[in-house]
Amino acid sequence: MLVPLAKLSCPAYQCFHALKIKKNYLPLCATRWSSTSTVPRITTHYTIYPRDKDKRWEGVNMERFAEGADVVIVGAGPAGLSAAVRLKQLAAAHEKDIRVCLVEKAAQIGAHTLSGACLDPGAFKELFPDWKEKGAPLNTPVTEDRFGILTEKYRIPVPILPGLPMNNHGNYIVRLGHLVSWMGEQAEALGVEVYPGYAAAEVLFHDDGSVKGIATNDVGIQKDGAPKATFERGLELHAKVTIFAEGCHGHLAKQLYKKFDLRANCEPQTYGIGLKELWVIDEKNWKPGRVDHTVGWPLDRHTYGGSFLYHLNEGEPLVALGLVVGLDYQNPYLSPFREFQRWKHHPSIRPTLEGGKRIAYGARALNEGGFQSIPKLTFPGGLLIGCSPGFMNVPKIKGTHTAMKSGILAAESIFNQLTSENLQSKTMGLHVTEYEDNLKNSWVWKELYSVRNIRPSCHGVLGVYGGMIYTGIFYWILRGMEPWTLKHKGSDFERLKPAKDCTPIEYPKPDGQISFDLLSSVALSGTNHEHDQPAHLTLRDDSIPVNRNLSIYDGPEQRFCPAGVYEFVPVEQGDGFRLQINAQNCVHCKTCDIKDPSQNINWVVPEGGGGPAYNGM
């Protein structure tokens, strides 16, 4: 059940918006209106308030059942499933018995998967050379490839020359959730133990500091943090090697970065938020196999982003469309969701949708840092693959093929080490250094290196258009071999400017036909969580959202969240506001954890199975 967004009925708040008080006065007003003698408790999660200090937990049995495996994989996306499949393929070919366990927080494989998606099939075909015979859902080869620059009223076509990264010749338009579901079936047929609905909540360590495995999350905890009568401790899964394939900005990967200092020699990751819808359209507007990409309006030149519109051949006139907004944007008044809704009204987009019906909505963060932001990938007992470390080719607008290849290479490296007659390890958890070496010698590394300067080239005075000029000159001539590497501008959360330095953005109201409100959109994601559990959007300090984020940045979390999770509502007594977290609405996009200017929000897993229920997104 979704939580409806509260109506901000506070007279002071309404007065501010009605009179459009000058932006220079906002921090002063916000601080005064937010003044309150006590800060209401928001966070009740045990990661913030440890249970060993809570009397309500005295006498509760906290023992966990443990299982052992050779390899444990966290996350059933393209990378995790590729690793699982390749491991079992190798085990069968060499008649080896290797136990592979894969845990996935979604209730069904593919239910948390969201992507455009236009697939470069190279790695997929390598993994499944007989994919046609097995009925893989690659139904829509690209037949037409278009790119354009949008102004408010016009579309300026740009030719896609052979060799440029955005060329889609030979690619397929896919519903990635369906493809992942099919891969899950292949993995199980090979003997992989797949456990959907089990969220990996904790990294376990040996006494020597190497990774021992993971623990799934506890269930049966009340919203206030007390144990229910149905409380059950999570399961421990121990392994010789644990593969972390959580996807973009994984919460366990965050811990591993700190534990093993994996980002010591790379730049901070930079991200985008991708918002997507599926529509059934009028058949006369349907062009199966057409791929459309644009940059420009509704975003300004200093806000990185772009759109996609893909015509699928799935037995009905179906299109997938979306907008990606770089999370290094500076204006706290920007709402990626409302920019997406506005984009659909462009004269080159709206005619495709008129007379159609929207059937699905979702959102997910994606990595945009590229080559410069790749961390160290291996550590004692584990390794990172896929979108967790970030192998997306940004100008190509693709990361599934590189994620799959990283999973394949990880599996081959692990298999070699597990089956080596001279297996030796300085730590209890195996350190598979061969994986990183093999990746650096693969086409993945070469591909990402060749486009390393395109995303940071958009930070110049010309913004996105400067990046296009750079691509046209240097990539076209030098193919990424220029003797320099551009840098990013720091972490995304650092880029946000105070509200007083920015202009509020006036968004048009949704018309209910082409554009829609937030709550009706989230309803189409199938999102659901157990209501009586602690919010998994935790705050390190409950006072910061009002005292800092609202005061200085006008509460950007109420805009950057694409699911209406965060609201500033009037306090029940006295003047001021408090932050309300509608955790049930969360679509697990991770944007809040990334963009919060105070880095106060920490996303952790809810009870397993909760979250969106995407169907082929």
UniProtKB/Swiss-Prot annotation:
Query: Which Enzyme Commission number(s) are on file for it?
Result: 1.5.5.1
Per the record, the domain of life is Eukaryota
What residues does the transit peptide encompass? 1-33
Keyword annotations for this protein, in alphabetical order, are: 4Fe-4S, Acetylation, Electron transport, FAD, Flavoprotein, Iron, Iron-sulfur, Membrane, Metal-binding, Mitochondrion, Mitochondrion inner membrane, Oxidoreductase, Phosphoprotein, Transit peptide, Transport, Ubiquinone
Q: In which residues is a ubiquinone bound?
A: 305-306
Positions carrying Phosphoserine are 551
Kindly list the positions annotated as binding [4Fe-4S] cluster: 561, 586, 589, 592
**Compartments (UniProt record):** Mitochondrion inner membrane
Question: What reaction is this protein's catalytic activity?
Answer: a ubiquinone + reduced [electron-transfer flavoprotein] = a ubiquinol + oxidized [electron-transfer flavoprotein] + H(+)
What does the entry list as the binding residues for FAD? 71-85
Q: Where is the PTM N6-acetyllysine found along the chain?
A: 96, 132, 223, 357
SUPFAM superfamilies xref list: 4Fe-4S ferredoxins, FAD-linked reductases, C-terminal domain, FAD/NAD(P)-binding domain
Tell me which residues make up the 4Fe-4S ferredoxin-type domain: 577-606
What top-level class of enzyme does the UniProt entry assign?
oxidoreductase
One Gene Ontology cellular component term attached to this UniProt record is: mitochondrial inner membrane
Q: Which InterPro entries match?
A: 4Fe4S_Fe-S-bd, ETF-QO, ETF-QO/FixC_UQ-bd, ETF-QO/FixX_C, FAD/NAD-bd_sf
What does the note accompanying the cofactor annotation read? Answer: Binds 1 [4Fe-4S] cluster.
Q: Which GO terms describe its molecular function?
A: 4 iron, 4 sulfur cluster binding; electron-transferring-flavoprotein dehydrogenase activity; metal ion binding
The role this protein plays is: Accepts electrons from ETF and reduces ubiquinone.
Q: Which family does it belong to?
A: Belongs to the ETF-QO/FixC family.
Summarize the subunit comment: Monomer.
Q: What is this protein called?
A: Electron transfer flavoprotein-ubiquinone oxidoreductase, mitochondrial
